[in-house]
Amino acid sequence: MRESLNNSTYIYLFRTFSKITIIILLSGLLIPSVSVSEVPILQPGAPGNPTRELDAETAVNIANSSYTGADVEFMKDMIIHHHQALLMSRLAIPSTNNQAILDLAGRIDVSQEDEISFMQGWLQEREEQVPDPTSKHSEHTHHTMIGMATTEQMTQLAESKSTDYDQLFLSLMIAHHDGAIKMVKELRDQPGSTYDPILNKFASDITNDQAVEIERMNSLLIGLSSDPRAGLASGLYDAEEAIMNMQLLESQRKPMGFYDPANPAERGAEEPDENTEREEESIEGDEEEITSIEEDAKNRRYPMLSFSNTDMAFRDDILVTGSYHGFNIYSISEEGLPELITSVICPGGQGDVSLVGDLLIYSVEETRGRLDCGLEGVIVDASLDRFRGLRIFDISDLSRPKQVGAVQTCRGSHTHSVVSGPSPNGKILVYNSGTGSVREEEELEQCIEDIPGDDRTALFRIDVIEIPVDDPSQSRIIDSPAVFADPETGVLAGLWRGGDHGDDSQETYITDQCHDITVFPSANIAAGACSGNGILFDITDPSKPHRIDVVTDSGFAYWHSATFNNEGTKVLFTDEWGGGGRARCRAWDPVNWGADAIYDIVDEKLEFRSHYKMPAPQLETENCVAHNGSIVPVPGRDIFVQAWYQGGISVIDFTDSLNPIEIAYFDRGPIMEDELITGGYWSVYYYEGTIYGTEITRGLDILKLIPSEYLSENEIAAAALAYPMIGHRRAFNPQQQVPMDWPATPEVARAYIDQLLRDKAIDTDTADQIIEKLDQVTIEMEMGGNNRLSRQINRFSLSAEGLNADVQTKNRFERLDATLKGISDGLRK
């Protein structure tokens, strides 16, 4: 059988068994021989059948666990799997002249053929059947294997040429390699599998080598993309940029004290033994093992203190940016540019913020948080010094904020939502979402983990917190409702229990927490992005939210955030696949994983309409997934500006829920060329005509939208005039959504006219007549009004009657008519 083994087999044998032989020889020297008396060896049969006696050799064969049936099936399947990779690669020479593709195909050809020979030898050595990958049976079998191309896809590949071949080859081969990695994972899940050291090493090599090759292929696929964001050059402060229909006004670096001057990018450190092992391998003459960028990132160590920028809140001319390290307060100029006023150090992460009057509410979740805002952390399991929950600061003196309240919670505060208040009795109501570990009971009473049968658990709940404005020190949890419970049985885990949804679906997190709850108080509803489900809540009684509807999505890994449109008739949910720290916008990632899901609210039910994912392929060094954003209040349209971590900023129009389209973007290259560092935009929000983005690692960016084929100058101007219909006139809190309204001004009227012209719903002559009158309004208003112009504008009677118009067009006509009537009223003396 040795003749059938190739060089790779001997390498595996030499590396593995040279070490094992030494151990066996040493064991022989140390273990004394023991005399064992002969006794019968018996094997019972099935119930009712006789017991039979075995000889020693047969007994050993029965008990032999050096390899399993799962190992054998894995090797057989992998031979067929590898064979298809050979077929795909050998189509390259007649199909493309791209040297990078030809080199890749050549490497795959050689490596896969060698590994097929090794697997055949492994099976032959154990007298197992060796499949013929060219047989009809094998061709039929491969359709059920993970990552294998279908017959139709193979035919399409064979008929493709040049760039079409390159793109299809890379897409199919990435899926093929990823399938091999999943086959290894499935094998390792089987009891007793990969016990054979040779097979174990081979399986590990497949996982690592294929992951590295996937990263290389992703880079090649990005290089074929025509999107300007694909393949941007790296840099911490000098990365290459791509921008469409936006203007970057300013980039401000983090304030002093909010970054490590010796490590501003917050790079992790390698494990010391990794360096030692690599040096030893180099000395021994072995080739250094290359690992994937993602695997390298997982294996790095990070310091206790984190300086990541997080969320934002606005009030009047004030901007507050949160951080894992504290928060910063800025004054916003008339041009929309922030100027730093105060920096407050108070570690604990993740630092989500809200502003209500002179109070700043701040989320703390990490176990290192201290009640006194100390930097040294807390190292013991239970301590009264530890703080996890909601901090409350008095910022009436912006130059010297003071902590005036602190509400301890069992799982800390990952995010929070200002639901209502101040009420007539001076109370603010807040929903708290804790996603961290449950505290020790010795540290905080009634904090109970997931003990089977104990309904007191801190899981499967949110906290309702009451903050008295006059005395925030008396803030407290007034309830912790089990909002996921089954209404009939009362079982707390009443929603998604975790796991996948079937073949080719995501592993979705269990619904035992809400990450974000966005409230829409004017309609008494809230949207919960609750780990395993999207939920629509009734908050008519804000202290007792209850579910109206629940949805799930087989492509969502973790329901992360929710945003209503301005009318509260739609919800855009986001999926944080990979937790935000992983590259999940690669060229080969599914377009409905780590994406947005858009739902219409119809009769209090969430009805799915579409997915949207930022379309530019990203490198392996760019963490990217859907994250926080806000509505851009363009009247008559649903426009959303959103953070995608290192995927940049994407602005979408989802007025047509079925067909969301990207209308603007801004992006930078990765922080590092060859290392995955968590960075990019945490949050991107629109406030009074300007877009602000907290860059996790770099600082704070300020941008504006500019006119384009998608968005007119009048629409941009109208959005800047929008104001909250209820509550404070100038405010924005991330998870408290208030519908915006617009004044009756020429800019707003022109915005509606632009939309009707774009949709060819109004004739040009009528539009020109209205615009001519609107052009006179500003001057006449400055002069105290004009009754004649008022009557002329009032005579315009606009309606969609007689037109075959959709609901959106009818609404625009109605709003334009109402705006013109408002302008007319304002002109009267």
Feature roles, as predicted:
Residues 36-226:
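All-alpha RGS (Regulator of G-protein Signaling) helical domain and cognate RGS-like helical scaffolds
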Residues 19-32:
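Bacterial N-terminal signal peptides
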